[in-house]
UniProtKB/Swiss-Prot annotation:
The gene is mazF4. It comes from Mycobacterium tuberculosis (strain ATCC 25618 / H37Rv). Transmembrane segments: none annotated. Its EC number is 3.1.-.-. SUPFAM superfamilies: Cell growth inhibitor/plasmid maintenance toxic component. This is Endoribonuclease MazF4. Toxic component of a type II toxin-antitoxin (TA) system. Acts as an endoribonuclease (mRNA interferase) on single-strand mRNA, cleaving between the first and second bases in the sequence UCGCU. Overexpression in M.smegmatis but not E.coli inhibits growth, this effect is neutralized by coexpression with cognate toxin MazE4. Disulfide bonds: none annotated.
């Protein structure tokens, strides 16, 4: 398996059913470690700054929950589901900064 890339979506089963997860860790880290950092995708809608709606060109319909951050072993990554658009990834970057209390321009 090639190293997963930031912005890619995989299905993972962490013991409560297979769910989609978006890789948010940087590509250099992804190449050199046995795990990745990811956030959950969900169909539940929340109108708070840490949730991002997927766009029409994204691989799934739903929302990214930037509050739900997990470290996933690469061996836990299941089916590849696609990659989010750069526009959606920019919104996710802002949501992650908000969730983690990081300064964002």
């Amino acid at each position: 398996m090639n190293a997963p890339l930031r912005g890619q979506v995989y299905r993972c089963d962490l013991g409560y059913g297979a769910k989609p997860w978006l890789i948010v860790s940087n590509n250099a880290r992804n190449r050199h470690t046995a795990d990745v950092v990811a956030v959950r995708l969900t169909t539940t809608r929340r109108t708070i700054p840490t949730w991002v709606a997927m766009g029409p060109s994204d691989p799934l319909t739903g929302y990214v929950n930037a509050d739900n951050i997990e470290t996933l072993g690469k061996d836990e990554l299941g089916d590849y589901l696609g990659e989010v658009t750069p526009a959606t990834m920019n919104k996710i970057n802002t949501a992650l900064a908000t969730a983690l209390g990081l300064p964002w321009p």
